[in-house]
Amino acid sequence: MVTGIDSFKEWFKGYEEQYAIIGGTACDILMTEGGLDFRATKDIDLVLIIEALDVNFGKKFWEYVKQAGYEHCNKSSGVPQFYRFSHPVSNQYPAMIELFTRKLDAIQLPEDTVITPLPIDEDISSLSAILLDDDYYEFLKQGKVTVDGVTVLDAAYLIPFKAKAWMDLTDRKAAGEHVDSKNIKKHKNDVFRLTELIDPATKVVAP
């Protein structure tokens, strides 16, 4: 189980409709629910559901960040907006939270927040491009499920996101961009692992 997920679950109880966890943490939660093992992962990839978001969630989120004492707070420019919070004061909190939002300033920062620019790596760039796609964003909203009090993207919906990221990174590496081969392999392996959770009768129309 991902370190700190219990404090996250308790803190955001009642806000399950306003976010979705994707990526490795979603895989870990789904695989654990299915009684299966998953690779170690330390970060929570959090997508805000803009249509359901209210100001209380933003306040609650920043209270959590402050209580966790994250040493590094970073923010990207442009849309979608991306935040990264890392190095909390204890392992009671997730080692890293990566938050994506399609709307600029969807959550308001307290005046005393110290936040620095965020360098964009290949994984962030790939996911940002996917979330900017209206069809993929609608697809994400359709695939939300609550597992043990935490909202994640269901396996049948997570697989297309992983496959899309794999294709995107593979194409970019072939075009000469610097892309870590480990990231490409990670997404492919996750797809194979997630297929263990799929009911053969399940039908999903991917974008």
Where are these regions (language model features)?
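Compositionally biased terminal segments of proteins
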Residues: 1-207
